[in-house]
Amino acid sequence: MRTTQYLLSTLKELPADAEIISHQLMLRAGMIRKLASGLYTWLPTGTRVLKKIENIVREEMNKAGAIEVVMPIVQPADLWQESERWEHYGPELLRFADRSERPFVLGPTHEEVITDLVRNEISSYKQLPLNFFQIQTKFRDEIRPRFGIMRAREFLMKDAYSFHNTLESLQETYQTMYQAYTKIFERMQLNFRAVQADTGSIGGSRSHEFQVLADSGEDEIVFSTVSDFAANIELAEALVPHEKRASPCETLRIIDTPNAKTIDQLVEQFSIPIEKTLKTLIVYAHKDSGHKLLALLVRGDHLINKVKAEKSPQVAKPLTFASEEDIRAHIGAGPGSLGPLHLKMPIIADRAVAVMSDFSAGSNKEDQHYFGINWERDLPLPIIEDLRNVVEGDPSPDGKGTLLIKRGIEVGHIFQLGTKYSQAMGAKVQGENGRQQMMIMGCYGIGVSRLVAAAIEQHHDQHGILWPEAIAPFQVAILPIHLKKSDAVRQEAERLYAELSSLGMDVIFDDRQERPGVMFADMELIGIPHTLIIGDRDLENNELEYRYRGIDDHKKQQLKISDVVSFLLEKINSHFNPK
């Protein structure tokens, strides 16, 4: 590809509205342009990277035995009503009507569509297992699209769906897909972790997320310092504390605290350890509990884990914090003055709360707190459950080592769905015993467009992107110095361009009339791993300058013209086929 026949579209200035490095570099490198909030046009350089990731994903899906299909992004609402996700999915589901006022959705996922297909095409257990995949555009009407393509409304995704007649068959395919995902991310040279995860709105019994480690990641992932344990923070269990509850040392007393509306203010004004404070969070109770509100208790230095709290049968789903109006109507005080003593509603306390003694909490009266509260002396122990996020240094749930917490970008998610969708939509086959049985499903997603941003978040420097070789937009850049002024430079550049291209290499030939500094800066910005610089002075010695710009190494050296092709072939093959 010649730059004079290509849309390079690089930018010198840092885009004002780009918050994270991948968004900045994708705009500056001419990979994407914003059309509207959360909607992006992919320019040629971005498209080349996207297609290379697609090819890796497609190759590994084919090796895993998945069959490629293409399903429509526009889906009839009656399928979503049948699965009951029409009511439960939320505002991210874009709903609209056609000219005949028939309701449709713009698909964020395709469980309903594939289940409808399979229930009409598959009738016997003998036709199972089957695993279908597609690489297709999705749409989620995000309330606040941000970070460029990282959280866009329209995005490219690989989604796969498997169908089985036994749990053993599902587990076998699940493991095959787990290994395929691992291979995909290894081929892309990403530093990632596969972590246990919550099934969320997709549903099912078991799931794993594949998280690319990056400081800009929106997710927190937890892993052991010793073992292979790894989980999303939403799922990581906070174990029952080893220590026993200490005996009371303080008397119960109530103190005026007019300027202590938060835990931090209470700690600062009364010089008490934050571990001796209690947060009382009021949420709406499940409609079958007989109560409107209930209280969740966590230690002052801990954060409530909404996913864990939602699993309590007494909590309304989704978990919703009570309005200040409802809190005041039921308790007589507002947030900042709440506590468990004399609270007339169900109470659920975190495990760490159960071993607290001589602690402080709101009195349920404005601007007053109790100090010296003790369980069983001043109030009975409530229901005890795991309600909090783990913190670094907590013991690992598998009993091996302690926990570290890193930020991650979710790029893949696999689920064992079970019969959630087949049950709702009547997807049955005739079993070995001759009776009808529900098909058992698995679901496997990869954010293809998000992978582009995730790779940049991990691999960049002050000059631009450092692409892993397998997904670089071009493998080789040819930079002739003063192309229009030197016949020798032009002839050698043309010869090398033709020869390298004939060998199947992705080559960009910068034939613009630009200063060398501009050419160097553009190639570094868009992240070309191998650069050949051809100038008159080097040609006099039958040489050229070679620069390597990889994710783990940068170097430059002189090469004999006669050695260039064999040198590049060896370098590129070594990166694609590491020992």
From Swiss-Prot:
Extract the CDD domains matched here.
ProRS-INS (cd04334), ProRS_anticodon_short (cd00861), ProRS_core_prok (cd00779)
* Gene Ontology CC annotations of this record: cytosol
- Report the EC code(s) recorded for this entry: 6.1.1.15
Cellular compartments annotated? Cytoplasm
Question: What reactions does this protein catalyze?
Answer: tRNA(Pro) + L-proline + ATP = L-prolyl-tRNA(Pro) + AMP + diphosphate
Indicate whether Lipoprotein appears among the record's keywords: no
The record ties this protein, via InterPro entries, to: aa-tRNA-synt_IIb, aa-tRNA-synth_II, aa-tRNA-synth_II/BPL/LPL, Anticodon-bd, Anticodon-bd_dom_sf, Pro-tRNA-ligase_IIa, Pro-tRNA-synth_IIa_bac-type, Pro-tRNA-Synthase_IIa_type1
Q: Does the keyword Mitochondrion apply?
A: no
Q: What class of enzyme is it?
A: ligase
Q: What keywords are annotated for this sequence in UniProt? A: Aminoacyl-tRNA synthetase, ATP-binding, Cytoplasm, Ligase, Nucleotide-binding, Protein biosynthesis
Question: Where is this chain primarily localised?
Answer: cytoplasm
Q: Which GO terms describe its biological process?
A: prolyl-tRNA aminoacylation
Listed as disulfide-bonded, the cysteine pairs are: none
* GO MF terms, alphabetically ordered: aminoacyl-tRNA deacylase activity; ATP binding; proline-tRNA ligase activity
Cited function: Catalyzes the attachment of proline to tRNA(Pro) in a two-step reaction: proline is first activated by ATP to form Pro-AMP and then transferred to the acceptor end of tRNA(Pro). As ProRS can inadvertently accommodate and process non-cognate amino acids such as alanine and cysteine, to avoid such errors it has two additional distinct editing activities against alanine. One activity is designated as 'pretransfer' editing and involves the tRNA(Pro)-independent hydrolysis of activated Ala-AMP.
Q: How does it assemble?
A: Homodimer.
Q: What's the record's remark on domains?
A: Consists of three domains: the N-terminal catalytic domain, the editing domain and the C-terminal anticodon-binding domain.
Similarity section: Belongs to the class-II aminoacyl-tRNA synthetase family. ProS type 1 subfamily.
This chain's protein is named Proline--tRNA ligase
Organism of derivation: Hamiltonella defensa subsp. Acyrthosiphon pisum (strain 5AT)
Taxonomic classification: Bacteria, Pseudomonadati, Pseudomonadota, Gammaproteobacteria, Enterobacterales
